[in-house]
């Protein structure tokens, strides 16, 4: 018996995908379902030899980066994407958010697959303990959670777009860096699958934010624009400290900060706003951009189901005589 109060929707209409109010809902749904993947199909165990070439400090860095990403995916899967559902303008938009929430949980599980393959239980426990104690990681989680739990739908979409299109990228840098040096290439292939999903998520939520702006007056639009840049500055300052804490020891901090600024501009574009950082502050290491590209060594195809590491069994019809040896 339920003892607490639970607010339930008292009436739901059957969703009709043959009648669309916004064609973008079906377009993004088809993209996301066509891109569906699971971490168990990526042979991360093939990375054990190159994992063994990393120093203890490099291994610790990699695990902490992935644990930080796990936290963001957990937030987005269980709170962020779900918080957008009540304010959806169409039932199809609601359905897309449920897909996004599910895939964020798949992403979170992906990092556990990497950990269980490459790391010991003690190392895994240490990494998760670190994630609970790192002030900058917990601070960015707190910032976005405040807006997810607030009562302003458009501000929720801004926070969600910044998480999807900006906050993940201090973590995404490292596997692309290793991949550009022919290390952890199967792990990088999995991360590319995640990045491909996040790119669609950020684009879609930003698009829905722009649709929402049309429904408010000029004063409200100006207020939301100011809010967006203020929130980005707050998150960026915290992200710089987080990046320094992680990457100073390996001398990659300045490169990662360029990658952050590059993706901050992309997040603003998703929201319909102009870039904040000038081009000379966003000149990302070409090796990183190459590792991100669909033509990277792993031959990842961003527009089909998976990268070359992704393994799906093929069904073949057999007859009795095929089993006569």
Curated annotation (Swiss-Prot):
Organism: Mycobacterium leprae (strain TN)
GO cellular component: ribonucleoside-diphosphate reductase complex
Note accompanying the cofactor annotation: Binds 2 iron ions per subunit.
Catalytic residues (positions): 111
Keywords: Deoxyribonucleotide synthesis, Iron, Metal-binding, Oxidoreductase
Membership in a protein family: Belongs to the ribonucleoside diphosphate reductase small chain family.
Reaction(s) catalysed by this chain's protein: a 2'-deoxyribonucleoside 5'-diphosphate + [thioredoxin]-disulfide + H2O = a ribonucleoside 5'-diphosphate + [thioredoxin]-dithiol
Name used for this protein in its record: Ribonucleoside-diphosphate reductase subunit beta
Pfam family, any one: Ribonuc_red_sm
Binding, Fe cation 2: 104, 164, 198, 201
Keyword Metal-binding: yes
Required cofactor(s): Fe cation
Enzyme class: oxidoreductase
EC number in record: 1.17.4.1
InterPro entries membership: Ferritin-like_SF, RNR-like, RNR_NrdF-like, RNR_small, RNR_small_AS, RNR_small_fam
GO aspect biological process, one term: deoxyribonucleotide biosynthetic process
Binding site for Fe cation 1: 73, 104, 107
Transmembrane segments: none
GO molecular function, one term: ribonucleoside-diphosphate reductase activity, thioredoxin disulfide as acceptor
Chain's role: Provides the precursors necessary for DNA synthesis. Catalyzes the biosynthesis of deoxyribonucleotides from the corresponding ribonucleotides.
Subunit structure comment from the entry: Tetramer of two alpha and two beta subunits.
Gene behind the chain: nrdF
Origin superkingdom: Bacteria
